[in-house]
Amino acid sequence: MKIVYGRDQKIKGSLTGDFDKDYAFLEAVFERSGDIVKNPFCIVDFCRAAAIYVDGMTDADMVEDFVIRPLLKQKWEEKISGRELLSYIENHVMETVDWKEDETFEDILTDILSGNTLLLLEGCKKAIILSTKKYPSRGVGETQQEMVIRGPKDSFTENMRINTALIRRRIRDPRLKMEHTMTGERSKTDLAIIYMEDLVRPELLEKIREKVKNISFDGIFDGGMVEQLLEENAWSPFPQFQHTERPDKAASGLLEGRIVLAVDNSPGVLILPATYQMFFQAGDDYYTRFEVASFARVLRFAASLFAIG
């Protein structure tokens, strides 16, 4: 089966409701992809279905226990249409799983490759997307680059969801907002724009939203790549973003009205805008008496001047 791409390199088309045709299309898209699990099954005798997900990025036990098994055990007294079946499943079977509907192949494929599960039903032009993400990740460990004597020892990981939770744990305020989007034409990397709704400058927030939206790059694999694509003056010797692997430092930046960018697969976040004096602050400064912390900053600044001289 021929896969049709548009000028923007996105797969065109939507589900047709013909199970054989739709399933064959997805099989063709995922040809030679050994990590894609395609699990066709029958809901009694009158409806075929299939669950499709990425092995290693999806909670397979959740798919089996809360999706496939309940559907196979469900007793149907009479034959119903695909749309009626979809509605019944959403209202009575998927009570313990977050889900949404999708119909375009572009959205469906993005969801599958993000770790969600596609439930394809015969006779239905819409599919159910189940939230079953379970990325492999390391646990929260001790910071390696910004070590402190006093203060928290935890650090960000490569899992963006863990990183946003570490920030939310420190700022339990409903005005803390996290806008999620994807960047990278091919990598489709998750990115979060994090800010305090009542403290951030609206014009700065809108500017960052627009810049993130206009990123045109095939693969985004780390926050450093985002930093290079967003900075205004590429020739400036001074950093325009501050990178940190400390959740408490990111939280402090948010409470100062700054914006934090969290990128999936990156063991740190970006704080912006960055000022010159921010790079002379240490993590310990937040947990030390003001006089002592200020004196330490003056010493660091003086030492930097001597080093340059």
Feature map (PLM): residue ranges:
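Membrane-embedded alpha-helical signal segments
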Residues: M1-F306
